[in-house]
Amino acid sequence: KLDLAKNRMYCNYAFYFGATADNSIDLASLNNLDGCCGIKLFAGSSTGNLLVAEEEDIDKVFQNSSKVVAVHSEDESILNLNKKLIKKGDVNSHPIWRSVECAISSTRRIVKIAERYNKKAHILHITTKEEIDFLSQHKGNITFEITPQHLTLFAPDCYLKLGTYAQMNPPIRDKTHYDRLWYAVRNNFNDTIGSDHAPHLKINKDKEYPASPSGMPGVQTLMPVMLNHVNDGKLSLSQLIKFVCENPVKIFGIKNKGFIKEVLMLTLQLLI
C-alpha cells in the first residue's frame, strides 16, 4: 500500500493493518511498522472481505493489539438475522436491515472487551443516539468518530432524494439520531470527525438495491461540508480543528503534527 501511495498522494497518509480471525498474533508487533497508524477491525461485514465476527476472535485482536483498534461496529449475527427485512429495490429498508440494535449491540461488546484488556478502541462512524449515550459514559481508552454525511443527511429524506447514493454502512438514520449526533458534537462527546471515504463508480451505485454498493466519497468533501456547518453556527471553528487535527494525532500517536507550535512540523490547509 505504501508503494502504491508513493508519488500519488499529496498529503500525509498512513494505513490500518487489517485484523482477521487468523492474524491476531501479528498484531502484537506493529509499533515499529512504518506507515501503520492502527488496526482496523470489521465486527460486521461491509465493503471488502475483512470480518472478525466471533467474540472469541475479537477478544484475541484486543488482547494482542499493540496499537489503537479502529472498529467498524455492527453485529454480524443481527445483520444475518435481519437479511429477511431487505426489500429489493427499496433502499429505505437499508437502516431497517442494519438496525439500531445491530449497532449498539456491537459497540457494547467492543467496549467491554477493550476495557477488559485496558486497550484503546476507536469506534468509527457512530450513527445512533443509543451509542452516543453509551459511549459518553465510557471515555478514557474509548474514543469515537462521527462522519459529515451522518451530520448532513437524515432518513427518509436522504433516500427519497438520493436513493442508493445515500446508501452506506452503518446507514443514515432518522432525525432523532441525527439530532443526537449534533447534540454530541455541540457537547464535544465525540473525539473526531472522519470521512469514511468509500467512493464507487456511478454504474455500480446505480444498481438496484441491495446490489448497489455502500459508501460515498469523503476525503475531499469533509472540510467543505463541515465548514458549511461552522458557517451555519452548528459548531465552532475551534471545535472543528480539534475534531480533525488535534484529537486524531493524540488518538493515533502521530508525532509532530496536528498543532501550530514552534517545535512541530507545520501542515496547513488553505481555505479559499
Task: Mark where each language-model region is.
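Alpha-helix-loop-beta-strand connector modules within alpha/beta enzyme cores
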Residues: 1-11, 58-71, 220-225
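Metal-cofactor-binding active-site regions of metalloenzymes
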Residues: 4-25, 42-47
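Short helix-capping segments at alpha-helix termini
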Residues: 5-11, 116-117, 139-141, 232-235
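Residues embedded in well-ordered beta-strands within globular domains across many folds
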Residues: 14-17, 40, 194, 270
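Histidine/acidic residue-rich metal-binding segments in metalloenzymes
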Residues: 25-41, 48-193
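His/Asp/Glu-enriched, well-ordered alpha-helical/loop segment
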Residues: 91-118, 187-193, 198-271
